[in-house]
Amino acid sequence: MDKLLIRGGRSLKGEVLISGAKNATLPELCACLLTSAPVTLTNVPRLQDVATMLKLIRNMGVAAERSDDGRVTVDASALSSPEAPYELVKTMRASVLALGPLLTRFGEATVSLPGGCAIGSRPVDQHIKGLTAMGAEIVVEHGYMIAKLPKGWTRLKGARIATDMVTVTGTENFLMAATLAEGVTILENAAQEPEITDLAEMLIKMGANIEGHGSSRIRIQGVESLHGCTHQVVADRIETGTFMCAVAATGGDVLLKHGRIDHLEAVVEKLRDAGATVARVEGGIRVQSQGRLKSQSFRTTEYPGFPTDMQAQFMALNCISHGTAVVTETIFENRFMHVNEMVRLGANIQIDSKVAVVEGVEKLSGATVMATDLRASASLVIAGLVADGETVVERIYHLDRGYDQMEAKLRGLGADIERIK
């Protein structure tokens, strides 16, 4: 099993190209199932989750071709199976995104309950609630969600959907299903993430009638059919934020090409308060940092607040900053699993339920640590970059699920990092 060997102590300098967003690519691949015409996505990252999704839709009879330049062309004209089996999706939470498109295209769908990171229950009940409001009949049995249209129905029907909580994948599922539903669908309490806006813009290119995306209230007027399009996947804001924290922690100077400050304002504000320089420049974002920064307390919330997917990486920065930081996780339970591994590197962190208190230390020391989930693995890489001596990060298959060639990009910025067996 692959590991990362990191020899810490080097500043990061240079330029790095930010890849397309995993959390936009996955729903957009599912959106390709809504039409029998070819759809081309560009700027598609090379990630394990993307490979899994491509394998899944190919298993349904879809033709999906990938080129070396980040282009994927999907032709779902021969879509033949409405099933997403457990064997294919057990490692990936995003499998639930196939439910809405398959139900819309086939009138039925059988989708395995999702896998992915073990960072909380992330229930599917909101998906079921929303699609049921549109008329779907759904049961959960033997580990599968089995959905169908009522007898005599040919389409879902528009509805007002108000979820009990903000749900990103739920909003995406309802958005895709509503494009071809009969009548108007109103999504209240909708998630506002840039990846949802990007999905909506792709669907509009395909002929959908959508208003209000990027706000908490989205209106979709169903249409008879969708057509193909070419769409560039938005840059990955979490990869952008991860590299920002790595540069800030190591005392570097890096241009993040294609990075967008407007998608990361809560993180940028905290980095500036900590003492880093973050500037919008032509072609991306420039991050500069010198010396030890000031610890920053923060609370994770839904977008546009501080993203839960950046909590672990910013905690790594807090570990070696001046002062004490209080980190409150409000989105997922079990999202402090990286803390014990950081403590192995010399960090001073105390946990009480959903709150972590981080007392900054002058230095970390290299050790062998184990990645427990996707963002935890990135945080351990950042900690390893600043630790004295050698750090080995095990179980980096988590990292490969969500970061496109991370060690190669870091090496290009001057880090001493290599993949080993």
Swiss-Prot record:
Q: Tell me if Nucleotide-binding is a UniProt keyword of this record.
A: no
Annotated Gene Ontology cellular components are: cytoplasm
| Binding residues for phosphoenolpyruvate | 22-23
An example of a GO molecular function for this protein is:
UDP-N-acetylglucosamine 1-carboxyvinyltransferase activity
Q: Which UniProt keywords apply?
A: Cell cycle, Cell division, Cell shape, Cell wall biogenesis/degradation, Cytoplasm, Peptidoglycan synthesis, Pyruvate, Transferase
InterPro entries in the record, alphabetically?
A: Enolpyruvate_Tfrase_dom, Enolpyruvate_Tfrase_sf, MurA_subfamily, RNA3'P_cycl/enolpyr_Trfase_a/b, UDP_GlcNAc_COvinyl_MurA
Q: Which positions does UniProt annotate for UDP-N-acetyl-alpha-D-glucosamine binding?
A: 93, 122-126, 309, 331
Its recorded name reads UDP-N-acetylglucosamine 1-carboxyvinyltransferase
Q: Which organism is it from?
A: Albidiferax ferrireducens (strain ATCC BAA-621 / DSM 15236 / T118)
